[in-house]
């Protein structure tokens, strides 16, 4: 009977197009290898990038499909899990990463209790998004503003240590210096 239940579970996962392995040990690499959309990056762990992109680019919002990956900065990731997995987070799992030239290491992952390196609880911010945006924050989605300008975000994205180096503009360099507390002289 146990074998039968195991086989049924495997069959259900395969028929639903959900790969449990994709969620168990997700691999997060260079943010710029993902698909850019209005200043953030998207992907899909299950290969359904077109469905993820359709929601991300929609002017009306929508519900992201399972496997959707969203990143604004290299060290923070949201992954959409299968429907019903975590109703309190709208099925989003939050990740805090340590990134280096060698790759990514998951520092923290979870649902309601993930706190980023600046002390902010991921869910506390994302749950403020208007319902049609499926907990994804942008400037006009209902979330509290983050203390980073678009220029700062772009500079942070360009300096992801997992990526091939790209030149920074003088403005981007000044933005990074301002972030690190430098005078920008």
Feature roles, as predicted:
Residues 5-14:
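Sec-dependent N-terminal signal peptides
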């Amino acid at each position: 009977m146990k074998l039968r239940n195991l086989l049924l579970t495997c069959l259900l996962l395969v028929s639903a197009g959900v790969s449990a392995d994709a969620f168990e040990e997700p691999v997060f690499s260079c943010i710029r290898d993902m698909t850019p959309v209005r200043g953030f990056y998207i992907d899909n762990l299950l290969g359904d990038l077109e469905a993820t992109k359709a929601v991300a680019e929609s002017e009306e919002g929508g519900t992201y499909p399972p496997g959707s990956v969203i990143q604004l900065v290299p060290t923070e990731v949201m992954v959409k899990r299968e429907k019903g997995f975590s109703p309190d987070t709208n099925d989003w799992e939050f990740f805090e990463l340590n990134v280096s030239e060698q790759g990514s290491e998951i520092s923290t992952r979870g649902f309601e209790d993930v706190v980023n390196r600046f002390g902010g609880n991921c869910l506390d911010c994302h749950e403020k998004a208007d319902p049609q945006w499926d907990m994804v924050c942008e400037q006009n989605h209902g979330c509290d503003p983050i203390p980073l300008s678009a220029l700062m975000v772009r500079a942070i994205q360009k300096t992801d240590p997992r990526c091939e180096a790209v030149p920074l503009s003088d403005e981007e360099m000044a933005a990074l210096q301002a972030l690190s507390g430098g005078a920008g002289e």
